[in-house]
């Protein structure tokens, strides 16, 4: 693949991004590789000078390694002798030029995206499971857990960002197309829009699951309004929109969808008993719990409007994943599958056995109750998880292991305090990706907001020991919730992904040690 300098100039001019250009010989010059990492350069590379931590020495390194053109928001002396494209916004430029370099792979895929404070990953996996059932496993995935760009085991790998940098995203999409994939299901984070990682991308289907305050802090969103604004961009950039009618800020979400989408292509869903007298648009799909237990989740989906009844998806569904909150995620995914052409039988078969590493993985022990590993990592997901456990186990003693990440998501900390005070009997506050912050200070900040008359607190920064002590302290009828990291096999500490066995592995080791059993978490 290659892209000419002239094509780059035309694209940047078309989007009013080009401020100036320095052409060394001819605009017919071609670039055969693209990169924003000075360590990843080939001969004739188009290099993007991006990021808050960018240093001119990176451009010098890229030049010496073979880059022949750079894109930046200002000219650099270090780029003397190179072609230069000076732009108003390098992140937008990188998205547009990467799409062109990789020959617009989105045009060869049916692209579906989920946004929401919680439920993105689960919904994405549910939909992938159903689409795979219909298309023979040709569904690509971009998620916070794994990325899948082909049918072979080596085509699946651990993701580093919920939504990759635009260059990586379009490269992965091209790989998926070349590997025969026909559909792409992806999570789109608020940061993806704030940092223009998906700039210029239009989705066939866009889902808005829910919203509550999260990712608000110095290095993320300055306030909730900014967070909401970024989330809403998915609605503006989708051909068809699926919205949870129960979401907070529904009016803003629906209004954003209608700016670019005809109401006939906007679908609403909600629980059967949900009522909102202020809602002046019909709810197309309803769902209702059939049975909840610690083995399966069963619910029924109703097509309530004429528009909804055109999709043959009405009926009963079973999920292997536990939690009544997953019924909403499942409903969203089923609607998406219906819009992609699937019927009830295909959906029911495809969704039934979907599991996600680190999401609602459970182990019933003999002497230490029910142990649950889940990725719940904000107030909304913690509240939903503990509420479900309280109801399902008839008000058990709830023991929670949790920590908050450093350098971001500062708003999560009071949310953890509030949720633990509301539902937990005992909390072990521990380390969870502290970054450059002191994990003890983070734990103490959470502890300061907890009502200690309701929740007993232990600060144990060694996460493995915290998990051990939590399980060891539990009785046969108790519930132990290990929250936040799921299947992550690392801790982000001072800029380094430090190896960590994962909560699932640690919890199983503890259970085996305490009870002498050699079993594995329910998948």
Swiss-Prot record:
| Organism for this UniProt entry | Lactobacillus acidophilus (strain ATCC 700396 / NCK56 / N2 / NCFM)
Per its UniProt entry, which superkingdom is the organism in?
A: Bacteria
- Which pathway does the record list? Cell wall biogenesis; peptidoglycan biosynthesis
Cellular localization per UniProt = Cytoplasm
Task: Mention one GO biological process in which this protein takes part, according to its record.
Answer: regulation of cell shape
Which residues does the record list as N6-carboxylysine (modified residue)?
Answer: 231
- Post-translational modification as stated in the protein's UniProt record: Carboxylation is probably crucial for Mg(2+) binding and, consequently, for the gamma-phosphate positioning of ATP.
Gene Ontology cellular-component annotations: cytoplasm
Q: Which residues bind UDP-N-acetyl-alpha-D-muramoyl-L-alanyl-D-glutamate?
A: 38, 162-163, 189, 197
Q: Which InterPro entries match?
A: Mur-like_cat_sf, Mur_ligase_C, Mur_ligase_C_dom_sf, Mur_ligase_cen, MurE/MurF_N, UDP-N-AcMur-Glu-dNH2Pim_ligase
Stated EC number for the protein is 6.3.2.-
Q: HAMAP family of this UniProt entry?
A: MurE (MF_00208)
What this protein is reported to do is described as: Catalyzes the addition of an amino acid to the nucleotide precursor UDP-N-acetylmuramoyl-L-alanyl-D-glutamate (UMAG) in the biosynthesis of bacterial cell-wall peptidoglycan.
Name the chain's protein: UDP-N-acetylmuramyl-tripeptide synthetase
Provide the family line. Answer: Belongs to the MurCDEF family. MurE subfamily.
Q: Which NCBIfam families match?
A: murE, PRK00139.2-1, PRK00139.2-4
Q: Which UniProt keywords apply?
A: ATP-binding, Cell cycle, Cell division, Cell shape, Cell wall biogenesis/degradation, Cytoplasm, Ligase, Nucleotide-binding, Peptidoglycan synthesis
PANTHER family in the record? MUR LIGASE FAMILY MEMBER (PTHR23135), UDP-N-ACETYLMURAMOYL-L-ALANYL-D-GLUTAMATE--2,6-DIAMINOPIMELATE LIGASE MURE HOMOLOG, CHLOROPLASTIC (PTHR23135:SF4)
Q: Where along the chain is ATP bound?
A: 116-122
The GO molecular function terms of this record are:
acid-amino acid ligase activity; ATP binding; magnesium ion binding
């Amino acid at each position: 693949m290659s892209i000419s300098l002239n094509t780059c100039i035309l694209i940047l001019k078309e989007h009013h991004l080009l401020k100036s250009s320095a052409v060394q010989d001819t605009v017919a010059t071609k670039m055969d590789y693209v990169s924003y990492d000075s360590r990843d350069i080939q001969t004739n590379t188009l290099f993007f000078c991006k990021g808050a931590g960018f240093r001119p020495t990176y451009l010098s390194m890229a030049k010496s390694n073979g880059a022949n053109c750079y894109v930046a928001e200002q000219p650099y002396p270090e780029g003397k002798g190179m072609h230069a494209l000076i732009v108003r916004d390098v992140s937008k430029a990188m998205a547009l030029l990467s799409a062109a370099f990789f020959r617009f792979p989105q045009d060869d895929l049916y692209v579906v995206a989920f946004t929401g404070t919680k439920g993105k990953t689960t919904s994405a996996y549910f939909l992938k499971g159903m689409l795979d059932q219909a298309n023979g496993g040709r569904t690509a995935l971009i998620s916070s857990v794994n990325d899948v760009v082909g049918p072979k085991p080596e085509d699946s790998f651990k993701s580093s960002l919920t939504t990759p940098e635009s260059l990586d995203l379009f490269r992965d999409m091209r790989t998926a197309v070349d590997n025969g994939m026909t559909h792409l299901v992806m999570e789109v984070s608020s940061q993806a829009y704030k940092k223009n990682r998906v700039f210029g991308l239009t989705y066939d289907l866009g889902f808005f699951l829910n919203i509550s305050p999260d990712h608000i802090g110095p290095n993320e969103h300055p306030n909730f309004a900014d967070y909401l604004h970024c989330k809403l961009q998915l609605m503006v950039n989708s051909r068809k929109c699926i919205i949870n009618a129960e979401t907070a800020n529904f009016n803003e979400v629906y209004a954003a969808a209608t700016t670019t989408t005809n109401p006939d292509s906007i679908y609403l869903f909600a629980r059967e008993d949900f009522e909102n007298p202020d809602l002046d648009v019909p709810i197309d799909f309803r769902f209702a719990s059939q049975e909840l237990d610690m083995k399966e989740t069963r619910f029924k989906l109703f097509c309530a409007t004429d528009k909804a009844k055109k999709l043959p998806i009405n009926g009963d569904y079973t999920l292997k994943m536990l939690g009544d909150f997953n019924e909403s995620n499942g409903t969203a995914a089923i609607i998406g599958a219906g819009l992609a052409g699937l019927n009830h039988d295909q959906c029911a078969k495809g969704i039934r056995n979907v599991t996600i590493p680190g999401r609602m993985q459970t182990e019933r022990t003999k002497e230490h109750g029910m142990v649950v590993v889940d990725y719940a990592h904000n107030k909304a997901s913690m509240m939903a998880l503990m509420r479900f456990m309280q109801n399902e186990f008839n008000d058990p003693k709830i023991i929670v292991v949790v920590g908050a990440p450093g350098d971001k998501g500062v708003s999560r900390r009071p949310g953890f305090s509030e949720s633990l005070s509301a539902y937990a009997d005992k909390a072990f506050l521990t380390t969870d990706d502290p970054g450059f912050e002191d994990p003890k200070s983070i734990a103490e900040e959470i502890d300061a907001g907890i009502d200690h008359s309701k929740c007993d607190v232990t600060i144990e920064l060694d996460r493995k020991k915290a998990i051990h002590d939590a399980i060891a302290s539990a009785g046969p009828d108790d519930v132990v919730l290990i929250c936040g990291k799921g299947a992550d096999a690392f801790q982000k500490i001072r800029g380094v992904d430090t190896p960590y066995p994962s909560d699932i592995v640690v919890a199983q080791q503890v259970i085996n040690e305490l009870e002498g059993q050699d079993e594995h978490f329910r998948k």
